[in-house]
Amino acid sequence: MQRRTFFKLGMASAALLAVAGGLALQIKPGLEPDGRLSISGRTVFTAVATAILDSSLSPDKAVRQQSVDSLLSRIDALVQALPPHAQAELSQLLALLATDLGRNTLAGLNQPWPEATVAVVQQSLESMRFSSLAVRQQAYGALHDITAAAFFSDRATWPLLGYPGPVAIG
């Protein structure tokens, strides 16, 4: 190998490592070490939950925000009950979705989660749901199922399902 070729290869490698290092610095865990949602995880789930539950949430902004905050607390409890390997996978998914590249690639969303309208996030979720790529479908399934489970674990939401509650025995 000539010295000039070796030098070019070295410079290209250094540039690639610098870019990869910069991307790695952008990735923040989706979950805290104790299993609660990190700030980036909360950002993703706030947008996702608002889009999934749009017609079930109050149109009043303050009540809606209170419902979403309560939902995020229930998501924290749900995620903390998951086994460690599932928490690790969810943390990776949320970390990826919190980056620009991950959000664009996996969710097909071109704008940051907080700036996207409910309709745009709904469209993004639908594209994940009906994607030909299994990884996008699985990501949608995880986000949807966690959101729905946490939402309907609250007794106040049961009437939306027509569920009167457990039958009293005795």
Describe the residue ranges of each PLM region.
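Short, functional C-terminal segments
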Residues: S153-G170
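Sec-dependent signal peptide hydrophobic core
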Residues: G10-A14
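Short, hydrophobic/aromatic alpha-helical segments in well-folded domains
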Residues: Q2, F6-L9, S124, I146
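Generic structural signal for short, solvent-exposed loop/turn connectors between secondary structure elements
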Residues: K28-L37, S132, A139, G170
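C-terminal segment of N-terminal export signals and the immediately downstream linker at the start
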Residues: M1-T5, L17-P59
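Glycine-rich, flexible loop/turn motifs
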Residues: P33, L109, T157-P159
